[in-house]
Regions:
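Extended, largely alpha-helical regulatory/partner-binding modules appended to the mid-to-C-terminal parts
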Residues: 28, 52-56, 74, 87, ...
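P-loop/Walker A NTP-binding region and its immediately flanking N-terminal helices
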Residues: 1-140
Length: 263
């Protein structure tokens, strides 16, 4: 990859799709001591140091809480210094769209003439809020939502590595609930595994406050029969079980959609 590395990258996409994770992998790839492959080896001191967070040349900054011009000016002062152990100093600025206008202007000055040893990786969920002057200086990569099937496959792999007894139907359900965000899926799995090492569909539904499909059929049948009393009774039962009512509405809409597709 020598000679083809840019000085500014923009990773954009919905939350939980791996932007920050990929930024760290990129930081390892450009600094890895094993130059026989474009992929990081994961075994050298640099790769291990980045994984553990002990390498000072990889700087993560949360723009949501460090969004002022002074924060960027401090960063601008730091970039002049050579990296201590890595080939490149990599600045990962998460939620970059949260920077103030003055902070963006200060960042732009640095990005216009970046030192040879510095790489910026900007991550955002709202790319439309990033000034065009910043966008024009970045190589852009869009992170799309991850499919439920791909999330389920990854969860089954993680469960195997962590010795969690994860049911395949439960993995598929978590994949759908995560709405394309792997981070959310892993969080749901972790929450369920904290309650019971055997994670099945019923446990996922209970922990996530998801309606049992039997209730969806009972409610839809009552509505179709114009039996409002039964429908409201079933909804009241779910409310008593602490089921999220907004999620219930979404699930009912999805249920009716599935019924229409099957008709």
């Amino acid at each position: 990859a020598a000679g083809r590395i840019g000085h500014a990258y923009l990773f954009t996409g919905t939350r939980g799709t791996g932007k920050t994770t990929c930024a760290k992998i990129f930081a390892k790839a450009v600094n890895c001591l094993d130059t026989t492959s474009p992929d990081p080896c994961g075994k050298c001191e640099i790769c291990k140091g980045i994984d553990s967070g002990s390498i000072m040349d990889i700087i993560e900054m949360d723009a949501a809480s460090n969004n002022g011009v002074d924060d960027i000016r401090d960063l601008r002062d730091e970039v002049a210094y050579l990296p201590s152990v890595c080939k490149y100093k990599v600045y990962i600025i998460d939620e970059v769209h949260m920077l103030s206008t003055a902070a963006f202007n200060a960042l732009l000055k640095t990005m216009e003439e970046p030192p040879e040893h510095v790489i910026f990786i900007l991550a955002t969920t709202e790319v439309q809020k990033v000034p065009v002057t910043i966008l024009s200086r970045c190589q852009r990569y869009d992170f799309t939502r991850i499919t439920a099937d791909d999330i389920a496959k990854r969860l089954l792999y993680v469960a195997g590595e962590e010795k969690i007894d994860l049911d395949e139907n439960a993995a598929q359900l978590i994949g759908r609930l995560a709405d394309g965000a792997m981070r959310d899926a892993l969080s749901i799995l972790d929450t369920c595994a904290g309650v019971d090492n055997k994670v099945d569909e019923a446990l996922v539904r209970r922990m996530a406050g998801v309606t049992d499909r039997g209730y969806l059929f009972e409610i839809s049948d009552a509505i179709n029969a114009h039996d409002s009393v039964t429908a409201l009774e079933k909804i009241a039962e779910l409310r008593q079980q602490s089921v999220d009512m907004r999620r219930l509405c979404m699930e009912l809409a999805g249920h009716y959609r599935n019924l229409m597709l099957c008709a």
